[in-house]
From Swiss-Prot:
InterPro entries: AAA+_ATPase, ATP-dep_Clp_protease_ClpX, ATPase_AAA_core, Clp_ATPase_C, Clp_protease_ATP-bd_su_ClpX, ClpX_bact, P-loop_NTPase, Znf_CppX_C4. CDD domains: RecA-like_ClpX. The gene is clpX. ATP binds at residues 118-125. Residues 1-54 form the ClpX-type ZB domain. Belongs to the ClpX chaperone family. Zn(2+) binds at residues 13, 16, 35, 38. Component of the ClpX-ClpP complex. Forms a hexameric ring that, in the presence of ATP, binds to fourteen ClpP subunits assembled into a disk-like structure with a central cavity, resembling the structure of eukaryotic proteasomes. Pfam families: AAA_2, ClpB_D2-small, zf-C4_ClpX. This is ATP-dependent Clp protease ATP-binding subunit ClpX. ATP-dependent specificity component of the Clp protease. It directs the protease to specific substrates. Can perform chaperone functions in the absence of ClpP. One of its GO terms (molecular function) is ATP hydrolysis activity. GO terms for biological process: cell division; proteolysis involved in protein catabolic process.
Amino acid sequence: MFKFNEDEEKLKCSFCGKDQDQVKKLVAGSGVYICNECIELCSEIVEEELAQTATEEFTDLPTPKEIMDQLNNYVIGQDKAKKSLSVAVYNHYKRIQQLGPKDNEVELQKSNVALIGPTGSGKTLLAQTLAKTLNVPFAIADATSLTEAGYVGEDVENILLRLIQAADFDIDKAEKGIIYVDEIDKIARKSENTSITRDVSGEGVQQALLKILEGTTASVPPQGGRKHPNQEFIQIDTTNILFILGGAFDGIDEVIKRRLGEKVIGFASNEAAKYDESALLEHIRPEDLQSYGLIPEFIGRIPIVANLETLDIAALKNILTQPKNALVKQYKKMLELDHVELEFTEEALTAIAEKAIERKTGARGLRSIIEESLIEIMYDIPSSDDVAKVVITDNTINNEANPELYDAEGNEVNLEKTSA
C-alpha cells in the first residue's frame, strides 16, 4: 500500500523557507511560492524605496536666489513677485523633500500662490519659467472654461489631466508638478451676497477647486470630458502639486481704495486721485479678494499673494531686448537665416512700447506689433538677393514709412523697383 510522505507534500515559501503550516497564506507562482509575511515585507521595502526616490528627485533643489537668477534670464522687472515666487517654490519642494516613510512631528502644509497683475505683466511666463527651472511637469488651464459638475463645460479634473499628459502619464512626476490656472478672477462671485440663482462658472467652480487645491486623491477620466458610470479613472494625489493662480482682477484697486478710506497709504489726501495702481496692490488683503468675489474657503487655499506691476515704457523696451529669448533677438535670428541683418532704432523700440501701452496689452502684445511692421519684409526678402540690411524706425512702427533697406555696400534698396 502507498505510504503518504508528509515532508515531501508540504509546500514551503521559496523566500523564507517556512512551510504552509507556519504561515497564513502561500501564493503560488511558476514553480515558486511566497508567503503572506514575505509579501508584507516586500511591500514595506518597495514603499520605503519609492518614498526615498521621491525625496532624491529634489536633492539638488536650487536656492531662492538661484531660482530668482533663472527668472531674471526670462522675466524683466517684477522683482517683488519673483522674490515671493522663488521663496514659495523653494519652500514647497523643500517640503516634499522632507516627506518620507517616517512620521514627522511637524507637518508642513502646502502654500499655493496667487499672482495678481494686469494683462501682459508676465504672470504666465513666470509660472512657465519656474517649471522649466525645476524640471517638473507644467500645465496651463483657463478658469473661464470650467463649470461645476453637472453643467456644460469642463470639469476641474480636466486640469489634472493636462498635467498628467505633460508628464507623459507618469503619475509620480505629475504629482510633483505645477499647474497655472489663468483668469482666476473671472470665477469670482458676481456679488458678496449669495444669490438664489446658480452661478455655474463662479462660486460653483471655486467650490469644485477647493479639494484639489488643498490636496485630495482625484479621479481623472483618461480621455478627458465628463465623468460617466462604468468609466475607468486615473487616480492622482494633488497634495504635492503646486497651484499658481493668476488674474488681472480689474477693479480691485477700487476695492482696496474703499477699504483704505479713499486715502492711499504714503500719499497725501489731496493726491488720492493720482494714486498708482501698483502701489495700491501692495496693500491687498484677503478681505479685498473676498469683496471682489472669492469665497473665504478659496482664499484660505492661496496664502501667498504676489502682485505684478503695470509695465512702463522702460520695462517694455528691456523686455524687447534683454531676456535670453527676447523678441528683438528672435527676429534678428529669423532674418539672419536669410543672410539679412535686422536693426531696430532706439526710437523704434520706444514706439513699440508706446503702442503696447496704448493697446493695454502689456508684453503680450509686443510680438503682434513687430509682426505687423515686418510682415511685408519677411514676405519679400526670401525672393530678393539685393537686401543685406533692414532698419526699423519709429516711422515704420507707426505705419508712416516702410522699413529702410540696404544692400551689402550700404546703398539704399527699393524692392518695388527691383521687382519691376
